[in-house]
Amino acid sequence: MKTRHHLFALVIALTGLMILSAQRAAAGEPTFNDFRPACFQKKIDVKTPGNRAAGLTDFARAFTLAFPSDVLTNALRARLDDPKNTRKDPNTLTLDPPHGYLKYNYSAEPGVWLELCFWTQPSGHRLVAVSMADTYNEDEEGLLLFYDYDPKTRSMKPFAAIRDEDFGRGVDGRIVELPRVGYDIRIYERGDRKSKPEIFKWDKGMHFDPQ
C-alpha cells in the first residue's frame, strides 16, 4: 500500500507541475528569468494595518504583490489571504514566524517552491531573502534575492551588495536552502541533496561568508 501511495503522490506532483508549465505557456506568463531584471531594481512597499510592525507574512505578501504575473506568487498570495485555507489549497505552506521563515511548495518535493526568511540587523533594519526554484525545469535558473527593509520608510530595497557570485560557484542550476533553524544559507547540487552542501555563514550584518 505504501508503494501505491507513493506512486499516486508522484503522479499528482508531476500532474501539478505539468499544469503549472501549461498555465505559464498558455497565458504567456513570464518565467523566473523573464522578471529577474526587475527583481534586482524594484523597491517594494510593505503595507501593514495601522502602526503594526511588519513581519513575515507582510514581507511575503508585499513581494507577491510586486510581481503578480507569476503563477507561483499568485498562488502564495491567495493562500496568505486565506489563512484558514477555506479554499482547500492543495499546496503546502510552512509558516514559522518565531524563526522568520516561510516556504510555499507549489507541488510535492522536489518541485516548485518559494522560500522567504529575514535576519534582524542591529540597526533595526531587516535583511529579507527570497528564493524561488523550479527543480524540474532545467531552463529555469532560479532566483535568490536580497532586500534591505527599513521600518521607517516601510519599504524593501534590492540589496545589490550581495551577488550570486558571492556564493561560491553561484546559485544557477543549484538548490538554495534558506535557514529555518540557525542563520546560515546552504546550497546543494541539483539532484543530489545527500551531498555535503556549501555553507555560507551570516556575519550578523549584511553579508554571508563561505565556510
Map each language-model feature to its residues.
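Positively charged n-region of N-terminal signal peptides that target proteins for export
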Residues: 1-5
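Bacterial N-terminal signal peptides
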Residues: 9-19
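Terminal domain-start segments
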Residues: 26-119
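Short, surface-exposed coil-to-beta transition loops
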Residues: 111-114, 128-131, 139-144, 170-172, ...
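Beta-propeller blade termini
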Residues: 115-122, 173-175
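Mid-length scaffold segments of soluble, non-membrane domains
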Residues: 122-159
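Short aromatic loop motif centered on NTY/YTY
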Residues: 155-211
